[in-house]
């Protein structure tokens, strides 16, 4: 059974039918994929985008869009996103043991790595996982391989809408951080 992001957010009390408002009728790269914003909590979310783990393991959904596959370098938007995330989140991760859940090619981890005690990526797409391990950034495809209470913070960008059971996954992530840690 898959739970929509909306249902998950409603269950934890950060949105409702009356406060959920259409924020945009598209994402940066997908026309017709609605982006919602809750008028009370400010939470922005995409609903119902889980396509199955196999899609994320082989990475085929990215092949036709990847400038990096053609040039060896990330595109401007991806680089810009990584820089913005770095600037916004360094204060939460500096000096800490962190993980990036759904880290993709590891752009964020590569930027924060020099400032953190340790970093680890959690990523299903095998070529990204292999590439990160090859450049010395630890990466796994198995959340359970990370000890409970071993991290200070876990970040995740544009991942929750791709999960079949978001609340269960968030609960699993929470177990991996120390008491008082961030998810």
Q: Regions from the language model: what does each represent?
A:
Residues 1-157, 166-170:
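Conserved N-terminal segment of class I S-adenosyl-L-methionine
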Residues 162:
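Phosphate-binding active sites in nucleotide-utilizing proteins
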């Amino acid at each position: 059974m898959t739970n929509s992001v909306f249902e998950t957010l409603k269950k934890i009390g950060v949105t409702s039918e009356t406060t959920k408002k259409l924020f945009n009728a598209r994402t940066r790269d997908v026309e017709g994929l609605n982006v919602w914003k809750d008028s009370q909590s400010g939470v922005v979310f995409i609903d119902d985008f889980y396509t199955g783990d196999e899609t994320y393991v082989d990475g085929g959904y990215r092949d036709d869009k990847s400038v990096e596959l053609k040039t060896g370098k990330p595109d401007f938007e991806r680089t810009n996103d990584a820089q913005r995330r770095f600037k916004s989140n360094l204060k939460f991760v500096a000096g800490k043991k962190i993980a990036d859940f759904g880290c993709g090619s590891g752009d964020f981890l590569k930027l924060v790595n020099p400032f953190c005690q340790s970093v680890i990526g959690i990523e299903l797409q095998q070529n990204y996982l292999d590439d990160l391990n090859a450049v010395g950034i630890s990466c796994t495809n198995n959340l359970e391989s990370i000890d409970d209470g071993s991290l200070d913070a876990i970040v995740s960008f544009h991942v929750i809408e791709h999960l079949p059971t978001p609340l269960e996954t968030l609960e699993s992530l929470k177990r991996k951080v120390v008491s008082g840690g961030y998810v």
